[in-house]
Design a protein with these regions (language model features):
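N-terminal Sec-pathway targeting helices
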Residues: 2-14
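Feature of secretome-associated and extracellular-like proteins
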Residues: 11, 99-200
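Beta-strand-rich domain onsets/edges
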Residues: 17-48, 54-56, 164-200
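Short consensus segments that form the blades of beta-propeller domains
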Residues: 28, 66-69, 96-100
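A short, structured loop/turn motif at beta-sheet edges
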Residues: 42-49, 79-83, 111-115, 156-159
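A short acidic/small-residue loop/turn micro-motif
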Residues: 47, 55-56, 93-95, 124
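Short, acidic Ser/Thr/Gly-rich low-complexity loop/linker segments typical of extracellular
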Residues: 61-91
């Protein structure tokens, strides 16, 4: 009986030790990125200079990373060069907290007179067979962190389209972590005769 109890105690100790190791190992993504891309006019294919690119990372908390909601974790912004190129640095996104996970980045791209970004030729493959579309999307994201991906911006043609696009904000990001993006949005709002976004 004592031998059985000793084995049981040893088994419980082993299981608890494994659980402790798992709990205190870093969780979430490892280093990800960098992200490289070129932004072009969807209609003409010509590069777009001066587009603001904002990358945002969020932290999910709670059991299974779902019950506690999410909050801002980090951001980086840059502006495209004369050839439309941009670069976002790699990130270490692990955390010691087993009940949180860093995810992202989500990309916000703004250039006055243009709409929301998409991967090049998305209209040709993105609305086809769901499995084909999903695989192509994964391939584009892999390319984004390898040789670089081409992103398209559609040119807006009406004031109403520009008004809708001017509300394209990363509201979860503090103003001091997206000054270029906020400046570009506020210039667009001013050109439309509207009040600027107040920093928070």
């Amino acid at each position: 009986m004592k031998k059985t109890e000793r084995r049981l105690a040893a088994g419980v100790t082993l299981i608890l030790s494994i659980l402790l190791v798992v709990l205190f190992l870093p969780t979430g993504s490892k280093a990800a990125g960098p992200w490289k891309g070129q932004i072009v006019n969807k209609e003409t294919g010509k590069p777009i200079e001066g587009a603001v690119v904002l990358a945002v990372w969020m932290k999910a908390t709670g059991i299974f990373h779902t019950t506690g909601g999410s909050e801002f974790y980090d951001s980086e912004e840059t502006v495209t060069d004369a050839e439309g190129h941009f670069f976002i640095h790699a990130r270490q996104t692990w955390t010691l907290n087993p009940f949180s996970r860093i995810y992202g980045p989500e990309f916000y791209i703004f250039k006055s007179g243009y709409g929301r970004w998409q991967f090049r030729d998305f209209d040709k493959w993105g609305l086809k067979d769901a499995m084909v579309s999903a695989e192509r999307t994964r391939a584009e994201w892999r390319r984004f962190t390898a040789e670089g991906s081409v992103l398209e911006l559609p040119q807006l043609k009406t004031r109403e389209e520009r008004l809708r696009m001017s509300s394209y904000m990363a509201y979860q990001v503090p103003a001091n972590r997206m000054p270029k993006f906020l400046e570009a949005i506020n210039k667009e709002l001013a050109s439309l005769g509207l009040q600027p976004v107040e920093p928070r």
